[in-house]
Amino acid sequence: MEFQAVVMAVGGGSRMTDLTSSIPKPLLPAGNKPLIWYPLNLLERVGFEEVIVVTTRDVQKALCAEFKMKMKPDIVCIPDDADMGTADSLRYMYPKLKTDVLVLSCDLITDVALHEVVDLFRAYDASLAMLMRKGQDSLEPVPGQKGKKKAVEQRDFIGVDSTGKRLLFMANEADLDEELVIKGSILQKYPRIRFHTDLVDAHLYCLKKYVVDFLMENGSITSIRSELIPYLVRKQFSSASSQQGQEEKEEDLKKKELKSLDIYSFLKEANTLNLAPYDACWNACRGDRWEDLPRSQVRCYVHIMKEGLCSRVSTLGLYMEANRQVPKLLSALCPEEPLVHSSAQIVSKHLVGVDSLIGPETQIGEKSSIKRSVIGSSCLIKDRVTITNCLLMNSVTVEEGSNIQGSVICNNAVIEKGADIKDCLIGSGQRIEAKAKRVNEVIVGSDQLMEI
């Protein structure tokens, strides 16, 4: 077994709590399938027979009861009161990890050719290979913004070599001063570095087993994304001794990069002597000189996905965008499953767009129009209703003559007769009164708050 696959399904969705207060984030519907279905399906498509899923007991129950997979899931439940980062979760399951690992987030929806990332990892005998995508802003408004400016996300500064594969620099702008400081040892080998500020980490990582061994012994690292990967990138082109000397000068790194916990103490001699991977792909390795590869023991690579679907569902806006995109993806992944479920009852079928999904046991009345929308299971949509660019979860009722546009309607909500709703988020179990006009509002229970 070359890799062990690990799906991280622990995070509670802190930036979309109005959605996750009643449904655990891994089970949030996207295209009428739980979010966690997408990384599991990706692994199954490329031939994985086993997967480790790190999650909570609530998600475990759903996985055992509802999921039908060929893969054998090994479900690891973290303690209910634990506040674990991704690195903490890897440490928690460490006894199960015997080989290199492939780590995916439960909220990743992508049609990436997974071998593109894995081949990088194999070809360069990398310590880390990761997936990134070009950032893209949705042109659609986010429900409930009320005209406020979108919060500016902190950008990552990503430096790569001329091939765009070797990851040479990685830092968030919040951690940077007014200048970028690049190691002289990197500039000697790569005098030209391409910097990107428009790349987004997809949270898909191939990691060498010795990196996991290092992580097990270094409890100060809690996050793969924000701590472990920048550490590995910094460690490139450094020997253990030279790095030790540098640490003595850099007080702010001392606590995390103690000599006894240096990544180089976990490297196996075989990793530097085994040149077979380079023989297989030498023609593709123009960016790294042959004589440098063995000495550069820590090697980080990135596959930048420029086309296709690659989205992490971490905010309401990204959740909406994912639901707009998945009908096309599902048509390719599950051609045997119709976009309109066979048990759905639709009076005016010609008014349901081919870009919409309709879940099981849903009823749609006469002269009701559904365009660019995802409708969940057991919904009741009465006559003369117009729904455009929306997501309706399960068991939603929409009464006669209502018009809903650009909105998310959560489980068991009721939209009464003649209501007009635009760019809103309606929380679970909420009721909108008849003939109400709601624009750019977030209508949720008092225990549901969210960062958009």
Swiss-Prot record:
- What does the entry list under GO cellular component? cytoplasm; cytosol; eukaryotic translation initiation factor 2B complex; guanyl-nucleotide exchange factor complex
Q: Which UniProt keywords apply?
A: Acetylation, Cytoplasm, Initiation factor, Phosphoprotein, Protein biosynthesis
* Primary localization: cytoplasm
Localization recorded for this chain is: Cytoplasm, Cytosol
Kindly give the SUPFAM superfamilies that the UniProt entry links to this protein: Nucleotide-diphospho-sugar transferases (SSF53448)
Q: How is its activity regulated?
A: Activated by the chemical integrated stress response (ISR) inhibitor ISRIB which stimulates guanine nucleotide exchange factor activity for both phosphorylated and unphosphorylated eIF2.
What residues bear N-acetylmethionine in this entry?
A: M1
Q: Which InterPro entries match?
A: eIF2B_gamma, NTP_transferase_dom, Nucleotide-diphossugar_trans
GO annotation terms (biological process)? cytoplasmic translational initiation; oligodendrocyte development; T cell receptor signaling pathway; translational initiation
Q: Determine the domain of life of the protein's source.
A: Eukaryota
Q: Which residues carry this modification: Phosphoserine?
A: S260
Question: A Gene Ontology molecular-function term?
Answer: guanyl-nucleotide exchange factor activity
Q: What does this protein do?
A: Acts as a component of the translation initiation factor 2B (eIF2B) complex, which catalyzes the exchange of GDP for GTP on the eukaryotic initiation factor 2 (eIF2) complex gamma subunit. Its guanine nucleotide exchange factor activity is repressed when bound to eIF2 complex phosphorylated on the alpha subunit, thereby limiting the amount of methionyl-initiator methionine tRNA available to the ribosome and consequently global translation is repressed.
Record note on quaternary structure: Component of the translation initiation factor 2B (eIF2B) complex which is a heterodecamer of two sets of five different subunits: alpha, beta, gamma, delta and epsilon. Subunits alpha, beta and delta comprise a regulatory subcomplex and subunits epsilon and gamma comprise a catalytic subcomplex. Within the complex, the hexameric regulatory complex resides at the center, with the two heterodimeric catalytic subcomplexes bound on opposite sides.
Q: Which family does it belong to?
A: Belongs to the eIF-2B gamma/epsilon subunits family.
What's the name of the protein?
A: Translation initiation factor eIF2B subunit gamma
Per the UniProt record, the source organism is Macaca fascicularis
